[in-house]
Amino acid sequence: QFELTLLDWAEAHKGARQYVAFADKCWPAFPEQFGFEPCYVNSRLASRGIPVACEVDIYGALSEYIGACISEDAVTLLDINNSVPAAMFEKAIKGKFDYELTDTFMGFHCGNTPSCKMCADRAVKYQLIQNRLLENGGTPDITRGTLEGDIAPGEITFYRLQCDSDGVLRSYIAQGEVLPVPTCSFGGIGVFAIKEMGRFYRHVLIEKRYPHHGAVAFGHY
């Protein structure tokens, strides 16, 4: 019903425009009001070429839309600020791939990545953190609705368009890959690697005051 409502709303409000994108409000308000998480529906829309950004990230939605146009494929939006554990790097990455620990990070979001960009064991589950916050860690009810699993390995392009506090549009773009390394975690998640990511994170993402969301196109563009 939620998916059909969004599609109907888009059709009714796009006017003469051909394409649409959404920037939805999700946690914590959505599950408490509607009784489920919107992530899986968001992933289905993204699979259809209708990008959906989490947490009312308008420029994230615009970034996704740009990637969808360029790649002519499904895209996603992920947190870019989660580290790969040193023990995981030592065990599964070091010596097997040409990356340093600081080149790697966990690309993560609750469960909005299209199923076509995830590994075969993906499944609809529940949001672990919100279950702890909203349901005291009990049997999941209103926190169900995430699409969880590891993101499929392959080439990616990470990018974002953003307006700064002076009203100036800025952007970044970086090419890398999702490594074939099990994350052993929850959500829609993957072990990402971008050469010199540590320097890029410090001197571009932080110094230029970019948000922690990055759009992902699957391939090098």
Tell where the protein language model's regions lie, with residue ranges.
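Anaerobic metallocofactor- and corrinoid-dependent redox/one-carbon enzyme cores
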Residues: F2-Y221
